[in-house]
Amino acid sequence: MNREKSPIPGDGGDGLPPQATRRAGPPAAAAAAEYDISRMPDFPTRNPGHRRAHSEILSLPEDLDLCAAGGGDGPSLSDENDEELFSMFLDVEKLNSTCGASSEAEAESSSAGAAAAVAAAAAAAAHGARPKHQHSLSMDESMSIKAEELVGASPGTEGMSSAEAKKAVSAAKLAELALVDPKRAKRIWANRQSAARSKERKMRYIAELERKVQTLQTEATTLSAQLALLQRDTSGLTTENSELKLRLQTMEQQVHLQDALNDTLKSEVQRLKVATGQMANGGGMMMNFGGMPHQFGGNQQMFQNNQAMQSMLAAHQLQQLQLHPQAQQQQVLHPQHQQQQPLHPLQAQQLQQAARDLKMKSPMGGQSQWGDGKSGSSGN
């Protein structure tokens, strides 16, 4: 904004309280403030028709540095003039921090101008020259914030890390902001508390998720072990089932073989029964004629024995005739007389031996013939 439009304390511009309610400051301080403001760089031009481009509920980050360049140009709940005064105040602080090698007179004039600006901003915020539309806040109106609490809450920056030191500086700047614009400081403090609560809820949620993940991992490990045991049992049962199937097939083959053997035996038994029945029908006739061949065989054997004895006697007689031709002639002429004469001892012994031989042969031949007859009758 141009210097002509920048409100200066005691200028009577819009947004400042009337002349009657203004505090009368020393003329030297006013001149010093006017001199410092004239040396400040021009502010960027802003469109007065669109003053609030951002949402009021937009939360600010925790590490926001309020002393950065252009930090006071953001929207606030106060009037436009109050925002411009606060921006001027921050720019004056920046100039004081960067110009440390300036003279003591310039430092005193800068501090005097800053004090005058702060006093004017506080008076404008307290009395309010004109009522404007106030946007609703997302927090309770009864909640208030004290600068002493904010300053006390921020510990010393000695021995802290960069992030903690930045937070402490931010808290200190927020305390200074509470003196100038308490509503904006209240909103920033509420946003910080909400962010802290959200972060805490997020951490709890993450911890709960980690606990659930660990529980699920433990269950997965247990289930994996159980699955391995079940797979091993299943493999054993499958092998046993295969062995039982092989045994069942072997038993079925044995049963089929037994059935075939039984059928063969039944057919053979039936055939033997049929053959036995046929033989039983023709066996009676053969038994009736079984005794006659035996009788004929016995008579024939006796006849053969007699013939053998006669042949032996004839041979013996021929020998006697050759040895004793005279005795043979007498025996031929007188056979009866020859029979009456006693035989020679040698001749008698030979005759007895021949008779014994005939007796031994005759029982054996009769028994064999009798056995042959029995076997023939039983076979028939």
Swiss-Prot record:
Q: Which domain of life is it from?
A: Eukaryota
List the InterPro entries hit by this protein, alphabetically: bZIP, bZIP_RF2, bZIP_sf
Report the record's disulfide bonds.
none
bZIP domain mapped to chain residues: 181-244
Region: Activation of RTBV promoter; residue ranges are: 56-108
Q: Name one GO molecular function term.
A: DNA binding
Stored SMART domains: BRLZ
Point to the regions of Low complexity compositional bias.
16-33, 326-355
- What SUPFAM superfamilies does the record tag this protein with? Leucine zipper domain
Gene Ontology CC annotations of this record: nucleus
Annotated segments matching region Disordered: 1-57, 326-380
Q: What does this protein do?
A: Transcription factor probably involved in vascular development and shoot tissue organization. Binds to the DNA sequence 5'-CCGAGTGTGCCCCTGG-3' present in the promoter region Box II of the phloem-specific rice tungro bacilliform virus (RTBV) promoter. May regulate tissue-specific expression of the RTBV promoter and virus replication.
Q: How does it assemble?
A: Binds DNA as a homodimer or as a heterodimer with RF2b. The heterodimer binds stronger to DNA than the homodimer. Interacts with TBP2.
Q: Which family does it belong to?
A: Belongs to the bZIP family.
Question: Under what name is this protein listed?
Answer: Transcription factor RF2a
